[in-house]
Curated annotation (Swiss-Prot):
Keywords, alphabetical: Ribonucleoprotein, Ribosomal protein, RNA-binding, rRNA-binding
Chain segments carrying region Disordered: 1-28
Protein's name in the database: Small ribosomal subunit protein bS20
Gene3D superfamilies attached to this UniProt entry: Ribosomal protein S20
Lineage: Bacteria, Pseudomonadati, Pseudomonadota, Gammaproteobacteria, Pasteurellales
Species in which this protein is naturally found: Haemophilus ducreyi (strain 35000HP / ATCC 700724)
Family classification: Belongs to the bacterial ribosomal protein bS20 family.
Amino acid sequence: MTLANIKSAKKRAVQSEKRRQHNASQRSMMRTFIKKVYAAIATGDKAASQTAFVEMQKVVDRMASKGLIHANKAANHKAKLVAQIKKLA
């Protein structure tokens, strides 16, 4: 239910809610991919970590290019995880 009275404002409210839900879904999916990399690192399996990282990198870069997250945040995620993967034997 919206507080808008004007037709265009009602439409914008509907569009905003739709967009908010889509963005929340995309953000959740991105976080899941990041968690998969952390889980792979925790097991100590370098090959699995690298595979998970490549998948995560694609998703994070796509979200950054679409403006869902800032490009620097994407870079921070990737740098932090690649450093941890390099520490694995």
